[in-house]
């Protein structure tokens, strides 16, 4: 695909480029995904996560933009792996856009077949929020990362990470949240990345405190701050598959160890040990098969080092990039001896229908987001943990692209919040409509046996009906755009997941759609976990009145 050097930035204000606010929202969010403040490699249409793209190629991108500008408010645009393929007459309450990205028949659901199709221009990798146009930069994963490290602190360190050292790697669009999430929980973190640009980007956006190319300096600073029980985040330039084994050989054991490199994609997401970034780029182009094999061997060493640290007392967990699976496939029989982050720390939240709920101010005015922050602080004042998050986010999170906010809200809370936001748009308190969406990593919208659905109580880890049902109910309930993707987070063959976005434009019709969608969407999370036999989900369903025919 041809790289194009152009700066894309979503329009701001209330002047429409399209025939309605829902079409306008889709257009602005597509463009926002490719804003240089937001996207990792906008010239390649790559938003985050290795090769997670917003559109298949530049011709398709322009065709999507043109289609959205002429789309009527009773029509629906269909997008197949980043390419607009049809516009059909529908109705005003139907989604304006339906997207299916990276989906392959199971027997062919592997990277090799995907790459054949990609090279022919027939498919793109949509990751989760890249191809579904609701990525908001690193903030999008920040609260989930904060919650994960917070729960680790509660389970293992008396409620705080003060006086602890976390070791991790991967400072891309997702992993870049880790340094700030650890320091928000009071801890010290060394975060490794092979790409200097990634570390510098996190420092620029205040997600990471300092940069070093010296392991000795990183360890000295980490030790100093750990002893002082003060937080600091250290971005260390290097390769985790080299640095972790070196630390093991020195007998240095962190308190926590995890990883968020893009190991889900051995070709485009991971750099083999012994190679500089430049050397790796050259090898990737000249001999991709050898590159993949070297990557997989390095991942095995990486996981071996994490297991060695676990044996010495570190709390180790997989952060959802499928690195354990690769190591296992390479012959490391005990690769799954440390858990994934969802069963270890997050699943109780899923049982309550909670997940990474986000909203974006189409006006471009940060004041609109600050006003919505006040809504959270007022309406959910009883939830001190949530309110603390909002206060910290206001102080420490720098917006990327259109102003946005994320917080984990549960069943009932999402619909309540959406209702209030729509009323604020209607009254003029907010200067333009608000886009409400979420990550595909949510309570009822993903099947991913090595991540979100790992170790389900009833063994239903691989059942993929749930994300499809989620997309179907959100579509019929009037979500503004709905997406079904394959391979996000953990790579080809390992996940199916669905996304939704709903626009609060202040109309009565929007109010009804919001009520329906923001009830059924988290409701699917409660239903999914009731079906798997989780008592907390059953309790939630009974308390909230979720109608589940065979619930006991």
UniProtKB/Swiss-Prot annotation:
Subcellular compartments: Cytoplasm
**Coiled-coil segments, which residues?**
none
| Predominant location | cytoplasm
Disulfide bond positions: none
Give the required cofactors.
NAD(+)
Molecular function GO labels: urocanate hydratase activity
* Catalytic activity, as annotated: 4-imidazolone-5-propanoate = trans-urocanate + H2O
Give the Pfam families listed for this entry.
Urocanase, Urocanase_C, Urocanase_N
List its EC numbers. Answer: 4.2.1.49
Q: Which UniProt keywords apply?
A: Cytoplasm, Histidine metabolism, Lyase, NAD
SUPFAM superfamilies membership: Urocanase
- Gene3D superfamilies documented for this protein: Urocanase like domains, Urocanase superfamily
User: Might you name a Gene Ontology BP term for this protein?
Assistant: L-histidine catabolic process to glutamate and formamide
Question: What does the record's cofactor remark say about binding?
Answer: Binds 1 NAD(+) per subunit.
Identify the catalytic residues: 407
Sites where the protein binds NAD(+): 49-50, 127, 173-175, 193, 239-240, 260-264, 270-271, 319, 489
Protein's UniProt keywords contain RNA-binding: no
**In which pathway does this enzyme or protein participate?**
Amino-acid degradation; L-histidine degradation into L-glutamate; N-formimidoyl-L-glutamate from L-histidine: step 2/3
Q: What does the protein in this record do?
A: Catalyzes the conversion of urocanate to 4-imidazolone-5-propionate.
Name of the protein in question: Urocanate hydratase
The scientific name of the source species is Bacillus cytotoxicus (strain DSM 22905 / CIP 110041 / 391-98 / NVH 391-98)
């Amino acid at each position: 695909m041809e790289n194009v050097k152009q700066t894309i930035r979503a329009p701001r204000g209330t002047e429409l480029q399209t025939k309605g606010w829902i079409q306008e929202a889709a257009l602005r969010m597509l463009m926002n995904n490719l804003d240089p403040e937001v996207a990792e490699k906008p010239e390649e249409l790559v938003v985050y996560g290795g090769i997670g793209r917003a559109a298949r190629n530049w011709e398709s991108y322009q065709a999507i933009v043109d289609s959205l500008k002429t789309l009527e408010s009773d029509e629906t645009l269909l997008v197949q792996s980043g390419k607009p393929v049809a516009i059909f007459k529908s109705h005003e309450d139907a989604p304006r856009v339906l997207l299916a990205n990276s989906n392959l028949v199971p027997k062919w659901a592997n990277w090799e077949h995907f790459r054949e199709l990609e090279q022919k221009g027939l498919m793109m990798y949509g990751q989760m929020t890249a191809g579904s146009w609701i990525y908001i930069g690193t903030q999008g994963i920040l609260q989930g990362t904060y919650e994960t490290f917070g729960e680790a602190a509660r389970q293992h360190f008396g409620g705080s990470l003060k006086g602890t050292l976390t070791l991790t790697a991967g400072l891309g669009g997702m992993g870049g949240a880790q340094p700030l999430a650890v320091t928000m929980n009071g801890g010290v973190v060394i975060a490794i990345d092979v790409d200097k640009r990634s570390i510098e980007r996190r420092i620029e956006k205040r997600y990471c405190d300092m940069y070093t190319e010296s392991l000795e300096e990183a360890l000295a600073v980490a030790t100093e701050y750990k002893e002082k029980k003060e937080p600091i985040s250290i971005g260390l330039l290097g390769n985790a598959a080299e640095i972790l084994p070196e630390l093991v050989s020195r007998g240095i054991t962190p308190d926590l160890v995890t990883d968020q490199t893009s190991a889900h994609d051995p070709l485009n997401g991971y750099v083999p040990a012994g190679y500089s970034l430049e050397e790796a780029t050259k090898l990737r182009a000249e001999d991709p098969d050898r590159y993949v094999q070297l990557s997989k061997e390095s991942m095995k060493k990486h996981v071996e080092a994490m297991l060695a640290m676990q044996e010495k007392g570190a709390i180790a967990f997989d952060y959802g990039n499928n690195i354990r699976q690769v190591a296992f496939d390479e012959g490391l029989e005990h690769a799954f001896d440390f858990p994934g982050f969802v069963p270890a720390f997050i699943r109780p939240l899923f049982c309550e229908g909670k997940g990474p709920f986000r909203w974006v101010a189409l006006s471009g005015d940060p004041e609109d987001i600050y006003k919505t922050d006040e809504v959270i602080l007022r309406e959910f004042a009883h939830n001190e943990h949530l309110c603390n998050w909002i206060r910290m986010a206001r102080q420490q999170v720098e917006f990327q692209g259109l102003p946005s906010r994320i917080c984990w809200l549960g069943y009932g809370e999402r619909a309540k919040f959406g209702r209030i936001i729509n009323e604020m748009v209607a009254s003029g308190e907010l200067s333009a409509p608000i886009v409400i969406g979420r990550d595909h990593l949510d309570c009822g919208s993903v099947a991913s046996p090595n991540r979100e659905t790992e170790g389900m109580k009833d063994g239903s880890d691989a059942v993929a009906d749930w994300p499809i049902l989620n997309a179907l109910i959100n579509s019929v309930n009037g979500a503004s755009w709905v997406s079904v993707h394959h391979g996000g987070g953990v790579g080809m063959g390992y996940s199916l997941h669905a996304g939704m976005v709903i626009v609060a434009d202040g109309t009565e019709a929007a109010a009804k759609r919001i009520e329906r969608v923001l009830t059924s969407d988290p409701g699917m999370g409660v239903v999914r976990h009731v079906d798997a036999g989780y008592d907390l989900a059953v309790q939630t369903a009974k308390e909230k009145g979720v109608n589940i025919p065979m619930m006991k």
